[in-house]
Curated annotation (Swiss-Prot):
Gene that specifies this protein: btuC
MF-aspect GO terms: transmembrane transporter activity; vitamin transmembrane transporter activity
Role played: Part of the ABC transporter complex BtuCDF involved in vitamin B12 import. Involved in the translocation of the substrate across the membrane.
Lineage: Bacteria, Pseudomonadati, Pseudomonadota, Gammaproteobacteria, Enterobacterales
Coiled-coil regions, chain positions: none
Name of the molecule in the record: Vitamin B12 import system permease protein BtuC
Cellular component annotations (GO), alphabetically ordered: plasma membrane
InterPro entries: ABC_BtuC-like (IPR037294), ABC_transptr_BtuC (IPR023691), ABC_transptr_permease_BtuC (IPR000522)
Pfam families per the UniProt record, alphabetical: FecCD
Membrane topology summary: Multi-pass membrane protein
Family according to the record: Belongs to the binding-protein-dependent transport system permease family. FecCD subfamily.
Single GO biological process annotation from the record: cobalamin transport
Amino acid sequence: MLTFARQQQRRNVRWLLSLSLLVLLATLLSLCAGEQWIAPGDWLSARGELFVWQIRLPRTLAVLLVGAALALSGAVMQALFENPLAEPGLLGVSNGAGVGLIAAVLLGQGQLPGWALGLCAIAGALIITLILLRFARRHLSTSRLLLAGVALGIICSALMTWAIYFSTSFDLRQLMYWMMGGFGGVDWQQSWLMIALIPVLIWICCQSQPLNMLALGETSARQLGLPLWFWRNLLVVATGWMVGVSVAMAGAIGFIGLVIPHILRLCGLTDHRVLLPGCALAGAIALLLADVVARLALASAELPIGVVTATLGAPVFIWLLLKSAR
């Protein structure tokens, strides 16, 4: 038994080291790739100062943090709702952020600065989170709370569609493109959003013990002494914050929170002590590679990153559905 535990521990360490190396390689690729390939040796040149340090570096950092946040949100939700198909958009938080953003554009008549739009997106996400907490205080089961999140997401999606469809504002049409996900507008002015993600990411990565208990089911978690109501509310708020900040920075990006945790579990990383940092690293890798594809796929334009992740994630999602039905 001791030998098996040591082998498992070494295997987990190898996984995390490998993922860390891949994050480094994907980061280097993201900084080099673009309309002009800039090798690391040219990063200190005048061209590198502009393209690498002022344009690509803030974008790369944002992609890293958003990828980690979405994957961690998926891992938390899958443990919280005991459903391997749960993902961040399922609770309606992403759509709530979109409603907040569109409301800001309508009320501000397109005159609000970017930081104000970001705050409105976060506020929209947190409002949906507070509504979910209201449901949670009624001691609903996780399945009913999940259905409440789906219903809220549908309502928010309908509100966004109505607002965009009847609007003649160019800004709202641009927001429709933005809601497909993209990092094209990210620069150092959004650094406050990146900073807002970091403490929550670190805190979530340290919550392996309650998540391991929650993954066993509500009954087992109660028997082990976990204050279920407290932790469920706290984790819903943390998930809402991560998703809200991510949507404010990059729009709605799907499938990262669904696919990454499930793939890592299939690879044997079931303990949340390893799964959580693994999800953060793997989510960052996946979104970095998707962002590179979005930048390079077309010569004259940039693909929405949500299109890239959906194209790659939809077949995996169908496979997961078929696998869970067996």
